[in-house]
């Protein structure tokens, strides 16, 4: 019989981790049939939000390592919205592996904790972790792949919240399939964030017969994610992920010079808020121009946590069903760069079919 808890470890105890941990506490008494702001599924399959238990935090920052997870999520430089107190969880934050996890700008504000890297694979086994969530900084290619090896060795499911291509990689997808383990990813698509809004508008233009000529999506915010992305060398996979998430909705070729999607700047006073500007220029009936402009303001990390809170439960369902490799439906709805792209309404139905057991994809 499956364990009726979802035991979750977190790599990278930053703002996204903070919102997720707060959210589990905040929504623990949510009723299954309520319409609840910020929640798609109070109960997802057999698992209510209160069934999510945290087992381990992994970080390198001296302000977090050695603390309880409930304390570390509020340590500097975290600066997201605090919407819930969190009691002591008796969940340690241990010293992780750095590799390329700290870039130029993060390295200026983060002091690495002393000591050696913890035995991550053994800790995941010892804590009976089911699912590991990756919240490392953008550009952490080597670090992510190092952690993936530990996760496979420990026998855990993997939810990849960042734009390092693991679930969408044929090599890594096969590694998880061969190990008999599920993976969801890559690069979390927030509840109502820049990517899904841009995708839906793109689909609307296409479905209504408006040819898309040019578009941009500019994003800026005040958290460490945007600070890190000032280092343009770390942005390649992020730009690919965000751009393809939009252009995959266009069934015809569009000049790459006419599409610009990506992070733009770091504005410290925005803290964990993100502001997004989207412009779309199209041609409609009679070759008449049609232009659209939109501004979106969100708190970045709660916006992602509302999706991750479902993704970890889908990963546990996949474990329960002994599914292996990339899980296509949840990956396509919850992430920017899944192994296979679907229109969002199709992906949404695939998630519901997966949850209900009508489909194992």
Q: What is the predicted role of each segment?
A:
Residues 1-147, 235-240, 276:
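N-terminal glycine-/serine-/threonine-rich beta1-alpha1-beta2 phosphate-ribose binding loop
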Residues 11, 50-53, 64, 72-78, ...:
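Active-site-lining helix/loop region of Rossmann-like oxidoreductase modules
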Residues 12-18, 137-142, 162-168, 189-195, ...:
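Gly/Ser/Thr-rich loops at beta-strand to alpha-helix junctions
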Residues 132, 158, 290:
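Receiver (REC) domain switch-region micro-motif
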Residues 158, 182-183, 212:
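Hydrophobic beta-strand scaffold residues
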Residues 303-361:
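NAD(P)-dependent Rossmann-like dehydrogenase/reductase catalytic/cofactor-binding core
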